[in-house]
Amino acid sequence: MAQAWAFLLPLLVLGSYVTSLFFPTYISNPLCGGDGGRSFHLCAQAPKDPDPPAVSTMYKTAFHFQPAKNWMNDPSGPMYFNGIYHEFYQYNLNGPIFGDIVWGHSVSTDLVNWIGLEPALVRDTPSDIDGCWTGSVTILPGGKPIIIYTGGDIDQNQAQNIAFPKNRSDPYLREWIKADNNPVLRPDEPGMNSIEFRDPTTGWIGPDGLWRMAVGGELNGYSAALLYKSEDFLNWTKVDHPLYSHNGSNMWECPDFFAVLPGNNAGLDLSAAIPQGAKHALKMSVDSVDKYMIGVYDLQRDAFVPDNVVDDRRLWLRIDYGTFYASKSFFDSNKNRRIIWGWSRETDSPSDDLAKGWAGLHTIPRTIWLAGDGKQLLQWPVEEIESLRTNEINHQGLELNKGDLFEIKEVDAFQADVEIDFELASIDDADRFDPSWLLDPEKHCGEAGASVPGGIGPFGLVILASDNMDEHTEVYFRVYKSEEKYMVLMCSDLRRSSLRPDLEKPAYGGFFEFDLEKERKISLRTLIDRSAVESFGGGGRVCITSRVYPAVLADVGRAHIYAFNNGSATVSVPQLSAWTMRKAQVNVEKGWSAI
């Protein structure tokens, strides 16, 4: 469960929206951050059934997953079952602010177009009356899906609960029944914190034939992926040691644990036999981002052992370097792949969200796999998203000298998919790399912006640009030379993305290693979907999700996309392809689907 206190600001002024409608009632409780250990904020009781104003559509995405209205956060329990993809998610039925969380539920056959159903889980038992928080789905032998999720009781104590589909012959699995013995797991062991015990993983079977599952928790004041065993998935016993723990933080949210094969983008099902040579990834949501480690699952010790132990978690690898949190992966048996997606929060203000009538979205589903060198995960948008492409344009053989700006015309700059390869004629001019930059790549992106010339770079894309460039977002690369390798910095700079002063407008960034002596091309793919921008650099080595709110979105046909180079070295573009993206059908029904 991604706790909203980590992101939201106090609701101080609600503006004209509230003035014209009503004054909401505010509540304060520990889950809203009033427990002394978290930042305090107010959770608003939003209008039950408002019609969002027309301006709400200005920033609303066309092909990202989000409900028709109201607040959403973490993906919870995605799965593929009997020909249908299911996306469960944290959802507030009552308004566009955090609170009253239930499990929203949508289904799809292609991961692009979604039908919205009634909530799968609502707050109606003592063990989840304060919220049906994040969890997972595991498919048991015989094709029996089972939900395990975190619930909060009236005192905000957290425990794990189970639910089963009422009718497995229903292709959409609309109704779920909670187990009579809920909660099945309580934080009653010595050293555990009862309000920091949440987000169970998908289960897997160990060599002894017993089910295992990890739960994010605080143990003796430090973070841990707590490990549990079960014969039947109903009765669980805590293992005397965690799957993995770290004493540098006190809570890991939304842990995810899965197997990967180096250099193979085929997915692996944890409940099946894991092939020789496989690695494991342990992901955790911490410090407002999703980080991960690559290692092995030691069957003898029943523990995760990272390949490299890095004490400073600022140096841990990230799933995404932007506005991306609480990600969840699942094994897609339909196409033998592992898919991951995460929550991208709004970076405007809570009063803006009330005015829009909605808040939050999920990133485009991504295939995720392990690079051939076994050092990092790679990600790429699922191929199904390409079904929305239309109006393709292509350019080959471009040369970008220092200061050049090439406009990519004839695509909808609000909804576009752009793929571009940059080729370096020479790498001799690369500036020297400072290893201290790895501690804070965002700071370096801010200090060395797209207008600051370097030896090689910056070069990349300018997107959502107004006519006079007073609003624009830059996604670009810089190339550096260290003693033994080349390092590429990828940035998504939002500082001039909007004229509005009341927004979060950082310069996101991440580094990746690249063997430029063998391969001189660096690829960039950017998907633009109004207020959501997702960029994939170096074949998915660095991914950055950004949220932007430019005024230019109000002027149809007035935004621009450019390729640029501000570095001293000339950059070639052997291939540039761009498409307008059609609108997907995403939870468009008014009310719940009646099918």
Swiss-Prot record:
<feature type="disulfide bond">
    <location>
        <begin position="445"/>
        <end position="491"/>
    </location>
</feature>
<dbReference type="InterPro" id="IPR050551">
    <property type="entry name" value="Fructan_Metab_Enzymes"/>
</dbReference>
<dbReference type="InterPro" id="IPR001362">
    <property type="entry name" value="Glyco_hydro_32"/>
</dbReference>
<feature type="glycosylation site" description="N-linked (GlcNAc...) asparagine">
    <location>
        <position position="235"/>
    </location>
</feature>
<dbReference type="InterPro" id="IPR013148">
    <property type="entry name" value="Glyco_hydro_32_N"/>
</dbReference>
<keyword id="KW-0732">Signal</keyword>
<dbReference type="InterPro" id="IPR013320">
    <property type="entry name" value="ConA-like_dom_sf"/>
</dbReference>
<protein>
    <recommendedName>
        <fullName>Fructan 1-exohydrolase</fullName>
        <ecNumber>3.2.1.153</ecNumber>
    </recommendedName>
</protein>
<dbReference type="GO" id="GO:0005975">
    <property type="term" value="P:carbohydrate metabolic process"/>
</dbReference>
<feature type="glycosylation site" description="N-linked (GlcNAc...) asparagine">
    <location>
        <position position="566"/>
    </location>
</feature>
<dbReference type="InterPro" id="IPR023296">
    <property type="entry name" value="Glyco_hydro_beta-prop_sf"/>
</dbReference>
<feature type="signal peptide">
    <location>
        <begin position="1"/>
        <end position="20"/>
    </location>
</feature>
<dbReference type="Pfam" id="PF08244">
    <property type="entry name" value="Glyco_hydro_32C"/>
</dbReference>
<keyword id="KW-0326">Glycosidase</keyword>
<comment type="function">
    <text>Hydrolyzes inulin-type beta-(2,1)-fructans. May play a role as a beta-(2,1)-trimmer during graminan biosynthesis.</text>
</comment>
<keyword id="KW-0378">Hydrolase</keyword>
<keyword id="KW-0325">Glycoprotein</keyword>
<comment type="similarity">
    <text>Belongs to the glycosyl hydrolase 32 family.</text>
</comment>
<dbReference type="Pfam" id="PF00251">
    <property type="entry name" value="Glyco_hydro_32N"/>
</dbReference>
<keyword id="KW-1015">Disulfide bond</keyword>
<feature type="glycosylation site" description="N-linked (GlcNAc...) asparagine">
    <location>
        <position position="167"/>
    </location>
</feature>
<feature type="active site">
    <location>
        <position position="74"/>
    </location>
</feature>
<dbReference type="GO" id="GO:0033948">
    <property type="term" value="F:fructan beta-(2,1)-fructosidase activity"/>
</dbReference>
<dbReference type="InterPro" id="IPR013189">
    <property type="entry name" value="Glyco_hydro_32_C"/>
</dbReference>
<feature type="glycosylation site" description="N-linked (GlcNAc...) asparagine">
    <location>
        <position position="247"/>
    </location>
</feature>
